[in-house]
A protein has these predicted regions:
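Accessory terminal helices/loops
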Residues: 1-9, 13, 173-180
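Metallo-beta-lactamase
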Residues: 125, 132-137, 142-180
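Short, function-defining helix-loop hinge/capping sites that tune catalysis or transport
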Residues: 26-28, 49, 75, 79-80, ...
Length: 180
């Protein structure tokens, strides 16, 4: 697990953590003054993520899911079981935020209950302490893929990369949606 931490004298906590054999990025976002945080795409090593959060004296209250693929939220993948939101919820009482078009996929791959998911739509907001997260529906990689705008930062999951965009050759993906 490797960490990139952008230190800035602001209210925003944002930490990028590379995790898992696919070198996914998980983010810890939240409020510096309240120490309240959410984990974006909690998958692979939930114990290490929670240990890191505890070391920083953060209080994790939510999980923000960009899309339902197991490498981003946990579940069965290629004959392996990836730890994710189900394991996180087993250790901490968090709320799971997924786009309304993605909720059924999150339930299917993770095994959590539909009632465990807060279904959001594009433009909805969430306050994490004194920091506001705006949900942005960005279909293409999956029908309910979403990004998160936090102050002047975009957390994009598998929608956007430095050198391209997420795959559009997977079941449920749509090239036209990705490029609009």
């Amino acid at each position: 697990m490797s960490e990139t931490n952008w230190e800035e004298p602001s209210e925003l906590i944002i930490e990028q953590i590379e995790i898992g054999p696919m070198q996914n990025f998980t983010y810890i976002v939240g409020s510096r003054s309240t120490r309240e945080v959410a984990i974006v795409d909690p998958a692979w090593d939930i114990d290490a993520l929670l240990e890191h959060i505890d070391e920083k004296d953060y209080n994790v209250t939510g999980a923000l899911i960009t899309h339902y693929h197991p490498d981003h939220c946990g579940g069965a993948m290629g004959g392996h079981s990836v730890a994710g939101v189900a394991e996180l919820m087993g250790q901490r009482p968090v709320r799971v935020y997924a786009h309304k078009a993605e909720a059924a996929g999150v339930v299917k791959v993770t095994g959590i209950s539909d009632s465990d998911i807060v279904k959001v739509d594009s433009g909805d907001t969430l306050s994490i302490g004194d920091v506001e997260v705006q949900f942005l529906h960005t279909p293409g990689h999956t029908p309910g893929s979403q990004c998160f705008r936090i102050k002047n930062t975009l957390v994009s999951g598998d929608t956007l990369f430095i050198d391209g965009c997420g795959r559009v050759d997977l079941p449920g993906s749509d090239t036209e949606d990705m490029y609009h």
